[in-house]
Amino acid sequence: YSTIGNQQSKPINALIEKLVNSGDSILTSKVIEAGIDPKDKTRAPQTMKDAMHKYLGVPNGDIYQLTPAKRTALGDECGGVVVTGDNDNPTYAIFDFGEGQAPRDFPKTLCGLSQTNKQQIPFVQGKHCSGGTGALSFVEEGIQLIISRKSPKVNNRQYSDDIGFTVTRKFPAGQRKSPTYKYFIINGEVPSFPAIPLSILPEIGNEQDAFCKDWEYGAFIKLFDYKIGAGLRTSSNIDLSNKLSVHLINPVFPIRFFERRSTSGKAHSSERTMSGLLTRLDTDRSQHIEQDTPYGFSFSVEKQDFTGQIYVLNSSTDRAIWNRFHGNDGVLYIVNGQANAFELNSIYRRKRIGLEYISNRI
């Protein structure tokens, strides 16, 4: 419990780790398909953006350089999120068509805690093989369904071709100090069955049947009754998409959201693509961004080099637009396209900085 319970304090961050894992799986699969060991320091990509450029066709690894049609197509090719359940605590199903895992490897990957299997792969984000379990703290009774199959594109007969599955659950503390989380096994092994197409994917335009399209490999993870929070559970996922874009300013692939809640409103599209904050800034440049921004800068701390960019919203931008872009966040600390820390925009109101008059627009 201490490992799972102490990972993430906010449900949005725990959900992001699932999306990060999907991106890692996609890139890892592409590298292996090219006949390269992901841990090979001479042949494998050394950065995430390099891998995106070489294997996903993303120019310089910048999602915003793709056309809207190509962003949507790339998202559909890689995976997405299906939203079902009710409006209070939606159920999120995260799926991808990446590397996938054989049943025997579940304990050290999809169900693993503090493993080191990713630490030697330079182009992935999730290094510690435990972030995926952080979401369990925000799931009703800790119930999560995991389905995975090793991709035939990377399975060299070293692994089982079966589909593995398990269910996690939270158990009360009882006489223990803390509750425990367990995952389902049979006779000490993750249950499995011979590979067959499973109708567990959404179909574009089909709002009546949430899961009707065949899935064959990769990963499918369903978080039941997820406590995402009042501000992010609205129908059509507009607020959630905006918030995710601040945390994932340049995701490995655009995240496709499929709204399939029966109680959701019909005022907005049931499908949405989240391409990250940098894409939104580029798309809205003519309307809301000061013409000469971003301003680039660089500095060094203890021989470590850092770079940054400063974006300024124009004076006609109102509070609703501020919230859509960055809310109260004034500084984002980014590693591999993911925000790892934030500073509130109140930092610009300090006397020694003296930017109070535009503090909400930086």
Tell me the role of every PLM-derived stretch.
Residues 6, 80-88:
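A short acidic-Thr-Gly-centered motif at the start of a beta-strand
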